[in-house]
Amino acid sequence: MNYLAHARRHLLTPGKITGPGAEAGPYFLAGVALPDWLSIIDRKVRTRSESAAKLLSDSDPRVVAVARGIIQHHFDDRWFHQTEEFLVLSSRFAVELRQYLDIEQGAQPGFVGHILVELLLDATLTAEQPDLLDQYYAAMDLLDPECVENVVNRVSKTPTSLVRPLIPRFIRERFLYDYAEDAKLLWRLNHVMKRVGLPQLPESLLNWLPTARERVTHARDGLMSGQHEDPPWDHWSNQSTTSP
């Protein structure tokens, strides 16, 4: 699951992100995004639910919101990756991508198929409600990056100083808008390939992306079937109160 799919339900909840008493709302969105942000800057930095739960009783509501967002992220990923639609689409994409990718040069069609389902789902959700991305970035713009980084360093065993500069760059680049167009999507995908050390994807993929996009749009409801489910907050709150 990618950024907007993680955030969508919370953006649509009146007063959750904006409005009276919602000052911590953007920090929940930051928590929901954090595991994906960390995959960009340093995969050795991990924010696990068990560690985040220890902060649920913190006196700072922003810290609590980030911790809740981290737990929500991992909960969402678990149900999402178990949906029939994700399993079928990612597997089919992996098979079809083999005719475009150079396996002998190290290309990994399974990895590409996996992330394509997630990015194209974000594109589908954006097309449904174009203002959602505007709301998302507006909420992110309210963050204190130092506060978010401090939470990461309390949760992760590996410290980092890279979260603080990443957040304004993430807001400035607004790359989630690029998923709507196949050429821009391919360009963004090749940024990912470079970052993880995989071969660049060929331009011939532009001939295949429209059918992939159409199938993800068709599977949208199944892919989002668990979107209204919540983590077992009582369980995680107990972890907070029993932690030293």
Regions found by a protein language model. Name each.
Residues 77, 81, 127-130, 195:
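Amphipathic alpha-helical interaction surfaces
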Residues 31-40, 114-127, 187-191:
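Short, hydrophobic/amphipathic alpha-helical patches that form generic packing surfaces
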Residues 121-130, 169-181, 220-224, 236-244:
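Hydrophobic transmembrane alpha-helix bundles
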Residues 84, 93-165:
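Active-site-proximal alpha-helical scaffolds that flank and shape metal-associated catalytic sites
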Residues 137-225:
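An amphipathic alpha-helical core segment
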Residues 1-111, 200, 204-244:
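An N-terminal structural lobe/cap that precedes and organizes the functional/catalytic core
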